[in-house]
């Protein structure tokens, strides 16, 4: 059996996006027609269940290019490829395939309770989850991104970074949640690298 001695559950990359790029993506959200996000795992697009998930979303087409020429889709894919090569070591075929990029807006008690990004049906092919923080951490209260693993100090759960422009990568099978936003607005991106189901 081959071991993976470099594995970490959660990877952070600060300054993945500039503040200007974050602002542009927030504007894209506000200029679009957001919809309520469903709970994934059905081919019908996800059941709306606000007891579990309450957030607005805008789905972007693939190959998202920002006004400064930054190829968002390409850079997320490259970051996931490097993370997989160095850290996760999942069985993924090249070229890596990315699911839709989804812009999210959490406000006024919006949340997403404990869940996995992988499940049945269309979510069964998710391998690596990617989150980008678009809001400044001073712009909202609550809304912490929390994982169901202990941190280095042995505390019960581990929190993702709140720093603006940061990329967070983790396996789709890792439990996580977004705590309710109690003040202000939290914008973020979520997407997934896809591959054959884990075996």
PLM segments and residue spans:
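Catalytic core of non-heme Fe(II) oxygenases with the double-stranded beta-helix
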Residues: 70-73, 77, 81-199
């Amino acid at each position: 059996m081959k071991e993976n001695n470099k594995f970490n559950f959660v990877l952070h990359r600060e300054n993945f996006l500039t503040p200007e790029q974050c602002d542009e993506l927030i504007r894209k959200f506000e200029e679009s027609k957001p919809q309520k996000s469903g709970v994934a795992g059905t081919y019908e697009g996800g059941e709306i269940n606000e007891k579990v998930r309450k957030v607005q979303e805008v789905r972007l087409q693939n190959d998202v290019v920002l006004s400064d020429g930054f190829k968002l889709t390409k850079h997320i894919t490259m970051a996931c490829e490097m993370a997989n090569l160095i850290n996760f070591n999942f069985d993924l075929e090249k070229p890596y395939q990315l699911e839709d990029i989804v812009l999210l807006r959490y406000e006024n008690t919006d949340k997403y309770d404990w869940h996995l990004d992988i499940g049945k049906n269309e979510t069964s092919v998710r391998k690596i989850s990617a989150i980008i923080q678009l809001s400044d951490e001073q712009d909202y209260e609550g809304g912490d991104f929390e994982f169901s693993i202990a941190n280095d100090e042995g505390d019960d759960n581990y929190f993702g970074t709140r720093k603006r422009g940061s990329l967070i990568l983790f396996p789709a099978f890792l439990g996580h949640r977004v705590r309710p936003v109690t003040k202000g607005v939290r914008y973020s991106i979520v997407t997934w690298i896809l591959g054959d189901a884990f075996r």
